Amino acid sequence: MSTTVLPPPDKKAEYVERMFSRIAPGYDTMNGIITLGLDREWRATTVALAAPPSCGRALDIGTGTGDFLVELTAWMPDGLAVGVDFTVPMMRAGLPKIRDRRAVFVAGDALKLPFADESFDAITTGFTLRNVTDIAAAFREMWRVARVGATVACLEVARPRHPLLRAGHWFYFQRIVPLMARALGADPEAYTYLPQSARIFPPPEELAQIMRAAGWSDVTYRLVGLGAAAIHTGIKRG
């Protein structure tokens, strides 16, 4: 059994910010390797479900190096995609991606977004919520800055339902991923934290209930990657 690296709740935000600052230079490469390249397809599906209007404004929360901004700007040739994150080195690493695109990075906290009420026509977030200290508060903030009729689409980790797939998923993320990180010269603690944080993340139906309690309507989800991830959507009704 591997030793836990999960921080106590009152230290989590600081821990996460420092961790992502350390791994920012190699984050995209490792993310692609860990997900076997499927993360690109999952992001494209998430943005399609959010369906941002071509001339509207979309927000990506926990944007990291801006992969979602690339997808959003493809949908919004006359709009603006805004990515918010509290880890500045991650956004700095992503600046080349958004050059010549209608997109901007903004430093900010998912639990206290630096935007006015009803500012955005669509909201996306990917692999972010397991790193926040209060998932319900994050969804309430998303609801606050969303315009009436806006869709939120959330890509997050899940655990396969089939026992064999579930066992294989556990072994891969708990054992293989940290070894891969060491072999590739990546931060071993960070790539131990990531699977450990995924393991305690709420399952899809529980996450859907959290979204509903935060005010989102018509909440649903679909599993992708043989159940290794889930995409939740909700709509802000008037």
Swiss-Prot record:
Gene3D superfamilies from the UniProt entry: Vaccinia Virus protein VP39
PROSITE patterns, from UniProt?
SAM_MT_UBIE (PS51608)
User: Annotated pathway, please?
Assistant: Quinol/quinone metabolism; menaquinone biosynthesis; menaquinol from 1,4-dihydroxy-2-naphthoate: step 2/2
Q: Any idea which positions bind S-adenosyl-L-methionine?
A: T65, D85, D109, A110
Keyword annotations: Menaquinone biosynthesis, Methyltransferase, S-adenosyl-L-methionine, Transferase
Entry GO MF terms = demethylmenaquinone methyltransferase activity
The lineage's top-level taxon is Bacteria
Q: Does the keyword Protein transport apply?
A: no
Q: Does the keyword S-adenosyl-L-methionine apply?
A: yes
Return the EC number. Answer: 2.1.1.163
Q: Which reaction does it catalyse?
A: a 2-demethylmenaquinol + S-adenosyl-L-methionine = a menaquinol + S-adenosyl-L-homocysteine + H(+)
Family assignment from sequence similarity: Belongs to the class I-like SAM-binding methyltransferase superfamily. MenG/UbiE family.
Role = Methyltransferase required for the conversion of demethylmenaquinol (DMKH2) to menaquinol (MKH2).
Name of protein? Demethylmenaquinone methyltransferase
